[in-house]
């Protein structure tokens, strides 16, 4: 929510895939006072928490939390989104979390990167942006799926624990279609090199 670059004037509809408790959707609602934000998650308990959080916020009238599988989701009015954000599942099949609800929400078999890009393309307007966070080990796969889906990289931030260490996560922002400029790449250390 805080990292994704969104144009307040051009962004009227935003979709948060895998909204969980709704934190990213709430951050976007705060940043984009003219936008409607839809959070979607497959886990009913997460959606209930997101609905409670949205209702307690000053942005409640612009937030909608939906319990659905993005693979089958259709916006009520059929209108495409201007921006999509996602913190997608990141566990591989070999490393399932013990809790079943967390497994459903975080398991890559439930929503592969290929499927994520197919549905982002289906739900996003041409020229719209798609921002997501992925494990660094998945970068090549994600960039490949993005290219196959007609997305172009706009921005990449490698998240490292300390300067000089290999990245743990990658923050990526794509545009559906051709990018107006060369992608901006940077690094975000979580701690100073000497700390």
Q: Model-predicted segments: where are they?
A:
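Conserved class I S-adenosyl-L-methionine
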Residues: 11-18
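Conserved SAM-binding loop of SAM-dependent methyltransferases across substrates and taxa
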Residues: 21-33
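Conserved SAM-binding motif I beta-strand of class I
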Residues: 36-41
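S-adenosyl-L-methionine
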Residues: 51-76
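A short acidic, Gly/Pro-enriched loop at the edge of an enzyme's catalytic core
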Residues: 75-83
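Mobile active-site "lid"/loop adjacent to the S-adenosyl-L-methionine
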Residues: 88-115, 119
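Conserved Class I SAM-dependent methyltransferase catalytic core
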Residues: 111-167, 171
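SAM/dcSAM-binding transferase cores
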Residues: 164-195
